Amino acid sequence: MKEKTCQTRCGTIHYWASVSNPDTITLVFLPGLTADHRLFDKQIQYFENIYNVIVWDAPAHASSWPFRFDFDLFDKAKWLNDILNQEGITRSVIIGQSMGGYVGQAYAQLYPDKMTGFISIDSAPLQRSYVTAVEIWLLKRMEPVYAHYPWKWLLKSGSEGVATTDYGRNLMREMMLTYDGNQKRYAQIAGHGYRILAAAMEKDLPYEIKCPALLMCGTQDHAGSCIRYNKVWHRNTKIPLTWIEGAGHNSNTDRPERVNRSIEEFVANIS
C-alpha cells in the first residue's frame, strides 16, 4: 500500500492505494465518522494481493488535516471520484462502513453508472422517507454533545459502544486517540458529519443503487437504529442483507473473517 494525496479546495486528502491493474476490480474502503483508514486493516491485509484496494482518511479525519469544514456529502463523493480518476480506476466496488456507506450512496446519486458494486457495512439508507423529522433535528445538534461530554467518558463509550471484541474496541480507541488533547476538533468532525448527513437526507433525492449491492449489519449493532433501518432497507429494495452474528457497529473489526468472506463471494459474483 502506498500513501498518496489528493488536493481539494478545502485541504489535502490522504489515501492509501495498491493498484496493479486499474481495469480490474478495485475495492474502495470508506471508514465511518471519526474512524480512519485503520478501520479496514483486516480487510486490506486479506484483499491487497487479490484485488486493487484503496482506503482513505476521510476529509478532516486523521492525516487528511488541516481541512476546512466547508463541504457537504456530495463534495466528499466528488473528491472520491477525483481519487478514482487519479488512479485510473474503471471498476470500483465501494465498501462503506456507517458514514462511508452514506458517501457511497451520494456517489451513486452523482455517478449512477460508475459503480460496479456497492457494499454497506453497518450503514443505513440516505432517503428522506426512512428518517423522522426529530431524527434530522437531532443530527443537526450533535456537536455540543461531543464538545462538552468528558473526554474520558467519550473514549470509553465511543470504543465500547461500536464493537463487541477486544480488537474492535482497542482499534476504535486508538483511532479516537488521534484527537487526544483536541476534543474540539473531534467534536467538529462528528458535528459536521451529522449536519451534512442531515442536509443530504433533506435534499430528498432518490439515492438509487443501480449496481449489484449487499447490506451487512452486526446483530449487536446498537448505533442509532441501524438494525431497524437495515431490515426496512432490505425489505423495500430487495438488496440482500447479511447479518454478522455477534458483531457491533464496526462489524468488519469484530468478525473480519465473516465480512471478508461475504465481500469475496459478492465480488466473485459480479466479476
Residues covered by each model-derived region:
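Post-His helix in hydrolase/transferase enzymes
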Residues: 253-265
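Active-site loop/oxyanion-hole signature of alpha/beta-hydrolase fold enzymes
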Residues: 54-95, 261
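N-terminal cap/lid segment of alpha/beta-hydrolase-fold proteins
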Residues: 1-12
